[in-house]
From Swiss-Prot:
Localisation: Secreted
Post-translational modification: Maturation of lantibiotics involves the enzymatic conversion of Thr, and Ser into dehydrated AA and the formation of thioether bonds with cysteine. This is followed by membrane translocation and cleavage of the modified precursor.
Temperature dependence: Retains 50% of its antimicrobial activity after heating at 100 degrees Celsius for 100 minutes, and retains 25% antimicrobial activity after heating at 121 Celsius for 15 minutes.
Name of this chain's protein: Lantibiotic nukacin
Length: 57
């Protein structure tokens, strides 16, 4: 069981090696002002929107 987990971790690490840093930043949203969405009144962090959409579920 432990060997299969190690092999899985190695496979994931190999996949990450194929991703360029610019591609990773684009996928993670790092190029977009670090998660801040500019609005008319102020900058809302993405966590604010996530809370609003998940607070009542």
């Amino acid at each position: 069981m432990e060997n299969s987990k190690i092999m899985k971790d190695i496979e994931v690490a190999n996949l990450l090696e194929e991703v360029q840093e610019d591609e990773l930043n684009e996928v993670l949203g790092a190029k977009k002002k670090s998660g801040v969405i500019p609005t008319v009144s102020h900058d809302c962090h993405m966590n604010t929107f996530q809370f609003m959409f998940t607070c009542c579920s």
